[in-house]
Amino acid sequence: MIEQFLMVAGAHFLALLSPGPDFFLIVRTALLHGWRRASGICVGVALGNGLFIGLAWAGLSAIQPGSPAFTILQWAGSLYLAWLGWQLLRSPGTSITVDGSTHGAPRPGWGQGLRMGLASALLNPKNALFYASLFSLLAGTPRSLQALYGVWMVSVVLGWDLLVAAAAGHRAVVERFARHLRSIERVTGATLLLIAVGVATQALANR
């Protein structure tokens, strides 16, 4: 049982370390508005992951590679990421002072961040695929233990994202990147567009 837990926890954490749309959204928001604002995105991301975990735990296999639901998820995620990336690329720019005040960008509410994080997690087909694959390997494991694994993974997602937000929103980090926020926004926007193109390409390849 301990070996299985270490396998599940290790695979999940390694997947978590891979930077994706959630990571870039959290870092940008924390740099601009502080970790408390970014925590809304963190909670939304954790809830989105929790929904996919719940579906995988329940044994619902509708979201599988090649299925209509998975294809719809791929295209919806691609369009959402492309929209986010384009918004950042066409932004007139944001300046920030070391006290955390910003100019040129509205301060998002906590609830708005939660909705953005939830959408980012739910519209990421890699999340659905990862959890479906992981729970398929646990078919012989007691359901109660699978549920505990699910709770553990949601907690780790939330804890890790909050840690990223706290690090990016630290005063020393903000001071270091205060003069480069426009470049960070452009890089973030370009990265999200590239991810969107990659997801769309996969969707076309799976037709």
Protein language model annotation of sequence segments:
Residues G66-I96, M153, W160-D161, E175-R207:
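Selective transmembrane alpha-helices of multi-pass membrane proteins
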Residues G169-V174:
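Short, flexible, glycine-rich and Lys/Arg-enriched loop motifs at helix boundaries
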